[in-house]
Amino acid sequence: MTVVERELSEPWEAVCCEPDGGSEAGVVVLAGSSGRVLRERARILAQQGMSALAIRWFGGPGQPAAIREVPLETFTAAVDYLKARGARRVGVMGTSKGAEAALLTAIRDPRIDVVVGNSPTALVWGGVGPGPDGSFTPYRSSWSWQGEPVPFMPYDDSWWDTAPARPRAIRGLYELSERTFAEHVDAAAIPVEQARADLLLVAGGEDRMWPSMTYTLRLAERRRAAGRTVRLISHGDAGHGLLFPGETAGPASAEFDYGGSEVADTLLGKQAWPHVLSALRGD
């Protein structure tokens, strides 16, 4: 299949990969806190017959420098783009913080037909990175909608006093923060049952960045309690960064321990891939 790539610079840095002639199935592709444009993932989705738009959602021109009150309108604009190119079914595939964004956007934009959440969270978390003054505190929400911050979980910074050496597994930061600020949990919970979109969640049991398997089960419980469907794909030995068929593993991080292994992460990606394609196509 011939794939056409279009580089975009407005309203965000992005690449749109699609079959020659376009497609009625479109998907917005979101990275996590790396801030990268996931070109390789967009390409493999386009090779499967979809219009895949991978965007940079922070750190670019005119965008927040860090993940602090990033407007969810950033992602609805991506839906606009795919709709304008003829997509009749639109999905959003996000990983980690990108999955958080995908879920929150689908709750607010009924045009989104499906969300694929890879290593997701069930809670809205505080921002990642410093504010304009260079300070990490006071914590602000990662997201805003219509100019207002989305309620969020703050972090318990005491965790850093006993943090492991680099590369760090920071899952414990999230687990401690949830216990410390338990009174924030209800307001920060992602009401995924409100999304019209179909939902597919993919998680590894050895995720050391945050407890994505636990979060996946919570999201599923909310959906099912509301009489909504959800599909779960998991692998007990996989970590935070699954690899789909056709993707290459990046270099190991010197800063973070993502858990899992290349073998297990690849197995999870292979296991999930047919379900991902089915969900995005609406099969």
Regions found by a protein language model. Give the residues of each.
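N-terminal cap/lid segment of alpha/beta-hydrolase-fold proteins
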Residues: 1-25
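Primarily recognizes the serine-hydrolase "nucleophile elbow" in alpha/beta-hydrolase
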Residues: 35-36, 40, 80-154, 171-183
